[in-house]
Amino acid sequence: MPTINQLIRKGREQVVYKSTAPALKECPQKRGVCTRVYTTTPKKPNSALRKVARVRLTNGIEVTSYIPGIGHNLQEHSVVLVRGGRVKDLPGVRYHIVRGALDSAGVQNRNRGRSKYGTKRPKK
């Protein structure tokens, strides 16, 4: 435990918070334009073709972001909304595209967890 004198001389060191999504610059989401839409394979124990997009954000930073859900309508020059959130089995993918916002359509025929995939409520 430090003495009063030591605290006066040095003070307490502030804990520096490191952002998990630095390209968003402390914003909850950012708009961007898709520069490339492609599929990639995950890390070792898993096997799939994961849909990802390279997105140039409005602040000029280019990031790789994941396209969640089954099927998508994105192509080059699509305007998308990007949020933070990494994909554990895709190295370098630290962002998600928000479905149902801007040019990204919601997932078709989805009944559960609709809000996460931008799907409207089905008609009775």
From Swiss-Prot:
Biological source species: Desulforamulus reducens (strain ATCC BAA-1160 / DSM 100696 / MI-1)
Recorded name of the encoding gene: rpsL
GO cellular component assignments: small ribosomal subunit
Gene3D superfamilies: Nucleic acid-binding proteins
Function comment: With S4 and S5 plays an important role in translational accuracy.
Signal peptide: none
Sequence similarity: Belongs to the universal ribosomal protein uS12 family.
Chain intervals with Basic residues compositional bias: 111-124
Self-association state and partner proteins as the record states: Part of the 30S ribosomal subunit. Contacts proteins S8 and S17. May interact with IF1 in the 30S initiation complex.
Domain of life: Bacteria
Ranges where the record places region Disordered: 104-124
Segments passing through the bilayer: none
Protein name per Swiss-Prot or TrEMBL: Small ribosomal subunit protein uS12
Entry-linked InterPro entries: NA-bd_OB-fold (IPR012340), Ribosomal_uS12 (IPR006032), Ribosomal_uS12_bac (IPR005679)
One GO molecular-function entry: rRNA binding
Modified residues (3-methylthioaspartic acid): D89
